[in-house]
Amino acid sequence: AQLGMKVALIDGDKVGGTCLHRGCIPTKAYLHAAETAEAVRESARFGVSSTFNGIDMAQVGKYRDSVISGLYKGLQGLLKSRNVEVISGWGRLADANTIEVNGTSIRGRHIVLATGSYSRSIPGLDIGGRIISSDQALQMDWVPSSAVILGGGVIGLEFASVWRSFGAEVTIIEALPHLANNEDEAISKQLERAYRKRGIKFHTNTRFASATQDDGGVHVATEDGKAFDADVLLVAVGRGPVTEGLGYEQVGITLDRGFVITDERLHTGVGNIYAVGDIVPGLQLAHRGFMQGIFVAEEIAGMNPVAQADINIPRVTFCEPEIASVGMTEKQAREKFGDRVRTVEYNLAGNGKSSILATSGI
């Protein structure tokens, strides 16, 4: 719209998608509440007298909702100010230039697919009751006394951090060799050390076998014979693309395990149809989708923008301690460049700001 084009935005839910309503924003609100709880517990060392009386989840929920509501209203106002026509309903591709929604056909010279993702589970493990996804975890009005988290990636690590700060006993089950396994091994090991110090238990190289639930809790078994009991089991094994039943394959778009395959310019190879965000293989990050949306808009406008590789996109896990990275891991760099790679480490424990905040740094 900013580039002078007429735009219709079709959305089956609220504009803002997963990030605003069920992902980044509510999770970060919880993380800030958790950080505040830790600050109260540690306040005496800074000369501040305070008492920690527990977590009021009803108030945490109100705080979360107020943040989401403010951003949602701002986004609605932004779309209105740009004269973007917002159509509520699930669209379905009818052909290379037509989307059907609410019984109406809408035609456009260009179509951008951005249908997002959903919380995945694993075969044989159904979400329900005490077995929850991040969607249900963000709506809980109580703090579990204990939780098992299946998955040691971004989602699992952030919820582990929140619940531990809220007072829960937390155990993470991860099939890969390390927590945050996609990061540099040195970072993963430092994070594991920090989580041990916080009292967060974890089992890596451990594969899930089964889970049952009853009024007393959820009971989890792993393939190596371990058993875990908790109030809830959070399934945090990643997110899957929302592409099924939307007509993508019928018009000739190539899917791989549900993901839309594009070229480096995010074109699907069909007509003037592009795809962005979580439905495109790669990092499932809101700012990646945002960047891709800008790229496609400029591409459609004939501005010939420079294509961006996922390797250049920053990645952050907002646990405690936080992790941030960009570019290759050391392992990836050595595989590509061999002995020409030089590694330099600087321990932030010696940084003045770290000393003031009384954080160890990594």
Language-model regions, residue ranges each:
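N-terminal Rossmann-like FAD-binding beta1-loop-alpha1 element of flavoenzymes
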Residues: A1-L9, I155-S165
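Glycine-rich flavin
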Residues: Q2-V143, T171, L176-A180, E185-I187, ...
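Glycine-rich Rossmann-fold phosphate-binding loop(s) that bind the pyrophosphate
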Residues: G12-D13, L150-G153, D278
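FAD-site-proximal beta/loop scaffold in flavoenzymes
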Residues: G128-P144, A227-N304
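Beta1/beta-strand and adjacent pyrophosphate-binding region of the FAD-binding site
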Residues: V143-I155
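C-terminal catalytic lobe of FAD-dependent flavoproteins
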Residues: K226-G252, V270, S325-I362
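Glycine-rich phosphate/pyrophosphate-binding beta-alpha loops
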Residues: D278-A286, C319, A349-S354
